[in-house]
Amino acid sequence: MRAFPFLLIILFSVSNLSCQTPNQTKEGTEFIKGVYGNPATLLKAGYRFDSLGMNAVFVRSISLNPDFYNTAKEQGVKVFVEFPTLNGKEYLKDHPDAWPINEKGEQSPPADWFIGICPTHEGFKAYRERQLREILDNYAVDGIFLDYVHWHAQFETTEPILPETCFCNRCTGKFGEGTQQKIQGESISEKATFILSHHDKTWRKWRSEILNGWIEDMGSILKKQQPEAKLGVFYCSWFPEDYDSALYRNLGIDPVGIAERADVLSPMLFHHMKGRPTAWVGEYTDWLGKTIHIEKPKKTLIWPIVQAHNNPGIVSPDEFRQVMIEGSKSPSSGIMMFSDHSLVSEPEKMEVMKKIYSEIEIEKEGH
C-alpha cells in the first residue's frame, strides 16, 4: 500500500437486476451518476437527464441559472455546483497585489491556461465568500464542490508546471507569525531562500494548513445556510511520491486533511491528460479509500471524475467505458464524467455512459 510521508501511512458490479437493489451503495444510499461541466448542453441537444440514467449534475457556477436548475429538479436529478475556489484569473485583472509570487520575488507566470492566486489575500477570500453566499441565497443545492483548492500550479497536463509560491510579504509575514519563526532577509528572494533552506518542512505544512482553512471556512458558510448540502472537493489525483512529492510540496494538498473537512472527495482521474493507463483509475480509487478510511473514523464519500474529453489525443469509446467501470469500483459511491460536449459530439460515448448508468449496481455489505 502506498503511504503519505505526512500522516498518510471495495466491488463494482454490472450484473443482473434480480440479485441486487439497483443503484445502491454498501451503505444503502443512492449511487451518484453524473455529468460535470455545463450539462445544459445535453438539454439543448434534446436529451433528458433521467433518460440517460443520470441522477446528478455537477454544474460550473458560471453556468448555473434558474432555468437550468428548475429543469434539473423537474427531471429528478441532484444539483451539485462547482465553485472555482483559488482560480485567480478573473480577480487578478483589478487586484494585481493578489498575484502569486515565486522564490525570485517575481510574479509567477500563468501555468498554461491556469493562473492561481495568493491564498492569504484577505480581499480575495471575502470576494469568494460573497460569491458562495449569493449562490446559496438563490439556490437550494445538493452540494458545493470546491475546485482549484491548491497553490498556483498546473497538473492537468502530461508534464506538470510546478512553481514555488507564494513568497509575497503577506505570506512570509503570516508564516513567521503563525509558526513563531523569525524570517531573515530584506528582499522577497532572500526571505524565500531562508525559508526553503531552514524551515522547508514547516513551510510545506503551513501551506497545506492554509488550504485546509479555506475548506473549513467555505464549509462553514455552506453548512450554516444549507446544513444538508454536501461539501465536496475536486483535487489532483497524484500518488504522494509522484513528481518528487509535488502533491504536498508544491500544490499543498493533503487528501487526509481534506477528508477530515469535506463530505466528498472527487479525485480528478483524467487519465489521458496525465498520461496514465485506464487501470490507474481503479488503482487510485482503491488506494484512496484505504488511505483515508484508515486515517479517520468518519467515512468520507469518494466520487471520482473521469475523462471522456479528447484532449490531449483521442479517448475512444472503449477507453471511456473502461475508466467509467474503474472509477465506479468500491470504495466509490458515485462517479461523474467530463465533459458534456464529449457526449453530444460523440454519440457512441453517450451510449457508453447511458448503458453503464442504467446497469450500475453496487453490492450491499454482506452480499
Please report, for each region that a protein language model flagged, where it lies by residue.
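Bacterial Sec-dependent signal peptides at the C-terminal "C-region" and cleavage site
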Residues: 12-26
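Catalytic domains of carbohydrate-active enzymes, especially glycoside hydrolases
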Residues: 33-67, 138-143, 258-264, 329-335
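Short, acidic/polar
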Residues: 35-50, 124-135, 245-258, 315-326
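Aromatic-lined substrate-binding rim segments of carbohydrate-active enzymes
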Residues: 45, 49-100, 206-225
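Active-site-adjacent "subsite" loops/lids of carbohydrate-active enzymes
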Residues: 80-139, 156, 187-200
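Conserved, mostly hydrophobic/aromatic
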Residues: 128, 135, 144-147, 222, ...
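Substrate-binding cleft of secreted/luminal carbohydrate-active enzymes
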Residues: 261-278, 291-367
